[in-house]
């Protein structure tokens, strides 16, 4: 993740010759930052709600939104390999899964690239003041900065959009085979 080169060619490769890290949580309770997994392995991909705006019909010029009051993190409901169609493809998967399971707002994949770190998703007062919750509305961290470091994380579980707990040791659901 982050600005390392372990991003499965910026999330466009499922080759076993690449190694990558979809920012899943490892056993030390931190986002994996090294090359732990082959890009052809199915892992959980985390998504973050970055806006309360709703998707709107084409006749409306702008989405309706209210100020963001908290940050919510969920996971895709099915494991994914490293070929997510790039960041845009991964973002589209997050948005589609959120809509499928009636999660409001706009969602994007919590993935870094070679040039952009996930830390930069929220900056300034948002990064220091908005609390971070999982999709079951359980407090995970007092703010984005703490969430990125896990130094004061309250709740250790991520959940997929459909409600399944995501395993922290591997970043995958205990049984993706029964996912919707």
Residue ranges of each PLM-predicted region?
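Secreted/extracellular ectodomain signature
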Residues: 1-180
């Amino acid at each position: 993740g982050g600005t390392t080169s372990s991003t499965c060619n910026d999330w466009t490769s499922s080759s076993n010759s690449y190694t990558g890290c979809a920012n899943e949580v490892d056993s030390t309770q931190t986002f994996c930052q090294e090359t732990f997994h082959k890009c052809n392995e199915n892992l959980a991909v985390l998504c973050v709600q970055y806006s309360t705006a709703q998707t709107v019909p084409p006749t409306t010029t702008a989405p309706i939104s209210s100020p963001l009051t908290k940050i919510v993190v969920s996971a895709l409901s099915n494991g994914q390999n490293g070929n997510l169609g790039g960041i845009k493809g991964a973002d589209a998967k997050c948005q589609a899964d959120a809509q499928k399971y009636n999660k409001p707002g706009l969602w994007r994949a919590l993935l870094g690239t070679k040039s952009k770190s996930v830390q930069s998703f929220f900056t300034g007062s948002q990064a220091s003041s908005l609390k971070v919750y999982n999709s079951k509305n359980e407090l995970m961290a007092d703010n984005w900065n703490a969430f990125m470091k896990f130094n004061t994380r309250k709740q250790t579980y991520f959940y997929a959009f459909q409600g399944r707990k995501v395993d922290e040791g591997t970043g995958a659901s205990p049984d993706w085979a029964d996912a919707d």
